[in-house]
Amino acid sequence: MARTFFVGGNFKLNGSKQSIKEIVERLNTADLADNVEVVICPPATYLDHAVSLVSHPQVTVGAQNAYTKASGAYTGENSVDQIKDVGAKWVILGHSERRTYFNEDDEQVAEKTAFALERGVSVILCIGETLDEKKAGVTLDVVKRQLTPVLEKVKDWTNVVIAYEPVWAIGTGLAATAEDAQDIHAAIRDFLAERTSRDVADAVRILYGGSANGANAASFRDKADVDGFLVGGASLKPEFVDIINSRR
């Protein structure tokens, strides 16, 4: 099944009004490959700003987090209704930094995912193992554990993209080999097929999210189950366009 190549840019807690303007203008004027979908995820304070600037038809905007309530006395949280209201289409959920620094667990991530989808916001769902888990040889056990509560709550996977992000590779400059990523992505897809159907699993895009950059992105080109990237630091730089065009 042909799956549209997908590149997400997670700006994390970086950027200013001016730098985000420069990033968006670079994307607006770039010669992007036809067969790619791009989502940029700036800090929440700049969501509206980014949406107002984007003019390229292949580029949309997403948030980096959302809560399980649409409104109420939840100081500091992001509402999916408000994310949608400013024109953003996506939200990143389950990122390892949210799991590590803010103690989000698998069940919370599943609740957030189900709620965002229910309210009409598409989800980039992050899963992945730590270095200790990798060394222990339990990578697949970890990603299956992370996916299981989501599978129990979400029956329609049309608007979900999975990002496999080995925690040991995020922000470290280390990266899984393209071959290793392919093996893990294929196993994730097989697990989805077991729990849903082969048709559903074959339609879900699975991204690689561990220190992808302009230098290594092309090495993933021929990997059948690597459907794109969730990019961190490199999404703030001109090389982001090279990553987007890495399958041209």
UniProtKB/Swiss-Prot annotation:
The active site is at H95, E165. SUPFAM superfamilies: Triosephosphate isomerase (TIM) (SSF51351). GO terms for molecular function: triose-phosphate isomerase activity. It catalyses: D-glyceraldehyde 3-phosphate = dihydroxyacetone phosphate. The keyword Protease does not apply. It is an enzyme of class 5 (isomerase). Substrate binds at N10, K12. Its EC number is 5.3.1.1. Pathway: Carbohydrate biosynthesis; gluconeogenesis; Carbohydrate degradation; glycolysis; D-glyceraldehyde 3-phosphate from glycerone phosphate: step 1/1. Belongs to the triosephosphate isomerase family. Homodimer. NCBIfam families: tim. This is Triosephosphate isomerase. The lineage of its organism: Eukaryota, Fungi, Dikarya, Ascomycota, Saccharomycotina. The gene is TPI1.
